Design a protein with these regions (language model features):
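Hydrophobic transmembrane alpha-helices
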Residues: 2-76
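Short helix-perturbing small/polar motifs within transmembrane alpha-helices
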Residues: 4-6, 10-19, 34, 41, ...
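Residue-level signature of transmembrane alpha-helical entry/exit and packing/kink sites
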Residues: 24-35, 57-61, 73, 104, ...
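Short hydrophobic/aromatic-rich motifs at helix boundaries and adjacent loops
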Residues: 31-36, 90-94, 169-170
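Hydrophobic residues within alpha-helical transmembrane segments
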Residues: 34, 78-82, 106, 114, ...
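Alpha-helical membrane-inserting segments
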Residues: 38, 42, 46, 64, ...
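Alpha-helical membrane segments and adjacent membrane-interface helices in multi-pass membrane proteins
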Residues: 43-121
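Membrane-embedded alpha-helical hairpins and interfacial helices in multi-pass inner-membrane proteins
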Residues: 94, 130-207
């Protein structure tokens, strides 16, 4: 009888664990889809500035990574990018399609993945180990700044390469003046806003 009872208990435990894994996987998929949608909405909020509009995309990417961590945050960004490349109008200006990669903003799209990796990695590293709210906010803000800088690097490099391939004269200084300088202040504001949102809402989102 004891053996049968232990076997039954083991079976029940295995079934419960399997059900828990399924629920966890379903919850992860829902969160990934939700933040992919958040990034899309952020992309639609844009202000035309030269060839590269000011959008809230980077803030959406930072929020996804900060809330979900590097694995699921990067997955959310990847889903967003794949939807856009498949033609779903999730990019800035309600646009989509693989042709976006050969436009001046194509490098930023690739850079979003690395921004998510950096910010998500910092979020995972901080976890619950750092209790001080200001310290956590400072680490996240620094990670977002680094992540967006990496995105700048991809965007500027892509922009410069496209200009040179089209036989148009463009120096690195010129590319920086078009791809980075006009966006420094807006991105600083977005970092502050993202950190405030994460600090206020993190306790309601369990990883």
């Amino acid at each position: 009888m004891d053996a049968e009872r232990k076997k039954a208990e083991g079976t029940e435990k295995a079934v419960a664990e399997k059900g828990g894994r399924r629920r966890s996987a379903a919850r992860d998929l829902c969160r990934i889809a939700l933040f992919a949608a958040v990034i899309a909405v952020c992309a639609w909020i844009s202000v035309p500035v030269g060839e590269i509009p000011v959008t809230l995309q980077t803030m959406g990417v930072c929020l996804a990574a900060a809330f979900l961590g590097w694995k699921r945050g990067t997955a959310a960004v990847a889903v967003y990018i794949l939807l856009g490349l498949c033609g779903v109008p999730v990019f800035a200006g309600f646009t989509g399609g693989i042709a976006k990669l050969v436009l001046p903003t194509g490098g930023y799209i690739v850079g979003f993945l690395f921004t998510a990796l950096i910010v998500g990695g910092a979020s995972d590293a901080v976890g619950e180990r750092i209790k001080n709210t200001w310290a956590r906010a400072g680490i996240l803000a620094a990670a977002m700044a680094v992540g967006i800088t990496v995105c700048y690097a991809f965007g500027t490099g892509w922009f410069l390469a496209l200009y040179r391939m089209s036989d148009r004269a463009m120096t690195l200084a010129g590319a920086l003046s078009m791809c980075v300088v006009p966006y420094l202040l807006p991105d600083l504001v977005k970092i502050v806003a993202a950190v405030l949102i994460v600090s206020a809402m993190k306790k309601y989102v369990r990883k």
